[in-house]
UniProtKB/Swiss-Prot annotation:
GO terms for biological process: ADP biosynthetic process; AMP biosynthetic process; apoptotic process; ATP biosynthetic process; diadenosine tetraphosphate catabolic process; ribose phosphate metabolic process. Changing H31V: Increases substrate binding and reduces catalytic activity. It catalyses: P(1),P(4)-bis(5'-adenosyl) tetraphosphate + H2O = AMP + ATP + 2 H(+). Residues 1-132 form the Nudix hydrolase domain. Changing Y27D: Slight increase in substrate binding and no effect on catalytic activity. InterPro entries: NUDIX_hydrolase-like_dom_sf, NUDIX_hydrolase_CS, NUDIX_hydrolase_dom, Nudix_hydrolase_domain, Tetra_PHTase. This is Bis(5'-nucleosyl)-tetraphosphatase [asymmetrical].
C-alpha cells in the first residue's frame, strides 16, 4: 500500500529573484523539504497540503497564491514502504517570518541551485527545476 502525502512548494520573489522555502526536519537525517505531510483519513491531497503547510510553517491558504495547475507527484520509498507526495507550487504573498512546528528545527529561503543542493535528492531537484521553469514563463 502506497503511503500518500502532499505539500506545497512555496516561493517568494525578492529583489527580482525567486527563492524557495525549505524546512529542516527535527529528526535524523535532518533532511530539507518543502512543507508536506501524510494525507489523513477523510482528506484528499489538496486538503492535506493546505493543512500541513499551516501546521509546519504557520502559513495559511489566505497568505498564498496557489498555482493549482502547476503540480507534480514524486514517488519513492520511505522506511521500506512506497510513498507518493503530491506538491503544488504556491507564492507567499507577504513573506513574513515562518513559524516552525516541533517537527522542524530550521528553515531557509534558497535560490534554485542552492535549494537543489540542500534538498539533496534527485527527484526534488527535478521538481524544483520544473516549477522554476513554470515561473520563468509566468
Amino acid at each position: 500500500m502506497v503511503v500518500k502525502a502532499a505539500g506545497l512548494v512555496i516561493y517568494r520573489k525578492l529583489a527580482g529573484k525567486i527563492e524557495f522555502l525549505l524546512l529542516q526536519a527535527s529528526y535524523p537525517p535532518h533532511h530539507w523539504t518543502p512543507p508536506k505531510g501524510h494525507v489523513d483519513p477523510g482528506e484528499d491531497e489538496w486538503q492535506a497540503a493546505i493543512r500541513e503547510t499551516k501546521e509546519e510553517a504557520n502559513i495559511t491558504k489566505e497568505q498564498l497564491t496557489i498555482h493549482e495547475d502547476c503540480h507534480e507527484t514524486l514517488f519513492y520509498e520511505a522506511k521500506g514502504k512506497p510513498k507518493s507526495v503530491k506538491y503544488w507550487l504556491a507564492k507567499l504573498n507577504n513573506p513574513d517570518d515562518v513559524q516552525l512546528s516541533h517537527e522542524h528545527q530550521n528553515w531557509k529561503w534558497c535560490e534554485l541551485e542552492d535549494a537543489i543542493k540542500i534538498a539533496d535528492y534527485a527527484e526534488m531537484g527535478s521538481l524544483l527545476r520544473k516549477f522554476s521553469a513554470f515561473l520563468a514563463g509566468f
